[in-house]
Amino acid sequence: MRILVNISYDGLFFIGSQKQPEGRTIQGEFEKILSNLFKEDIKVIICSRLDSKVSAKNFVFVFDTENKSNISLEKIRRFLQDSFNTEVLIKTVIEVPPSFHPRHDVKYKIYSYKIQNTAFFDPLISSHLLVVFQPLNLKKIKQGIKLFEGLHDFSLFSSDSQEKNTKLIINKTWVKKTKDFISFYIIISICFKFLDYMARIWHRSFFLFYIRSLYVYK
């Protein structure tokens, strides 16, 4: 049987989502926990490869098991949740068709970045976002982020010089302001992928260019 698990996790506690020879990863941790539960070698297929320190709100993965002990889905969920502290939330555990694939069958992915735009910073959340003290010009930021929509060559936004296909499509971008926070959102279709470190370099470059060079302040 193939089982899908939907989680949210705090990226500060992991060096990434994909399994690495050393260090704590989402894929590596769940493979160890599930192998211990089912008493068989469990391999996890993750929906996306996220960088170190990147958090996820709806991150899914699947695994296959013979489940000879006939363990219920709710027991699996509780066992997984009890294996973590507060860095991971197990949202749902469901059975899916054997053909379901968490990367190939998803329609799109949404990437988000948040700025705390106030005269002070909150030390309880500042490690999870960018803090900008000067008032930002939201109108100019909205105009700037729209430049990334459509088909473009993003080779300068990748750390992999060997990547052959660097022309990608960003379907939609938008900016949302709520009180002291400004959030940026990027939507890409599953038929396209982000290059290595593209999302991280993309948003860093955007802020360096628009905040430092164009002075997008009020």
Identify what each model region corresponds to:
Residues 1-218:
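Structured-RNA-binding interfaces characteristic of tRNA pseudouridine synthases
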